[in-house]
């Protein structure tokens, strides 16, 4: 295989990875939109959070396809892993900080698990896209950021299992 053909395959692979991330982001955003009304019924702050997550994830889909820069990919990883960690905290420790249900532990549900799996998939796909066609220095930095995110999620999962 010539180096030109190999380069085209790698570029196509990265593009496919970005399409996976964009599709999962759209899915997670639509799932958040689906449950936004019930969260507004609980408290305006919960509803506003879900509306913000919806907007961010739906808008992220075209952004990551049009401008797949390192900062855009890293922002997607950090943002989605933050939502995953908040989700796991609300299912183990309780809703943090604000609102009438602060401190209450939420139940796991089918729709929210689907959204969380989508968000983890986004982080993995974006991490893979970061590692393709990168310099050794930026690859190390990207791996470190992805590793910190995954260790953080792993730690929260550990807390979930320990709490149940």
Where would I find each of the regions flagged by the language model?
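Short, Lys/Arg-rich, polar N-terminal cytosolic tail immediately upstream
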Residues: 1-13
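Alpha-helical transmembrane segments
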Residues: 18-30, 147-152
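Short aromatic-rich membrane-water interface segments that cap or initiate transmembrane helices
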Residues: 102-117
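Core segments of alpha-helical transmembrane spans in multipass integral membrane proteins
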Residues: 23, 27, 47-63, 78-88, ...
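Transmembrane alpha-helix entry/boundary detector in multi-pass membrane proteins
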Residues: 14, 34-56
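Juxtamembrane boundary at the C-terminal end of a transmembrane helix
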Residues: 153-164
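Membrane-interfacial entry segments at the cytosolic side of transmembrane helices
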Residues: 70-74, 132-147
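Membrane-embedded alpha-helical segments in integral membrane proteins
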Residues: 24-39, 159
């Amino acid at each position: 295989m010539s180096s030109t053909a190999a380069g085209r395959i790698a570029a196509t692979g990265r593009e496919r990875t970005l399409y996976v991330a964009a599709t999962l982001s759209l899915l997670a955003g639509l799932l958040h939109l689906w449950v936004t009304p019930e969260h507004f019924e609980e408290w305006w702050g919960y509803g506003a959070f879900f509306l913000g997550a919806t907007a961010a994830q739906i808008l992220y889909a075209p952004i990551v396809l049009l401008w797949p820069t390192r900062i855009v990919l890293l922002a997607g990883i950090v943002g989605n892993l933050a939502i995953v960690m908040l989700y796991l905290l609300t299912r183990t420790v309780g809703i943090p900080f604000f609102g009438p249900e602060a401190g209450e532990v939420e139940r796991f549900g089918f729709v929210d698990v689907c959204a969380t799996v989508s968000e983890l998939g986004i982080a993995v796909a974006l991490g893979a896209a970061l590692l393709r066609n990168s310099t050794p220095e930026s690859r190390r930095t990207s791996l470190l950021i992805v590793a910190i995110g995954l260790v953080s999620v792993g730690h929260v999962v550990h807390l979930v299992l320990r709490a149940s």
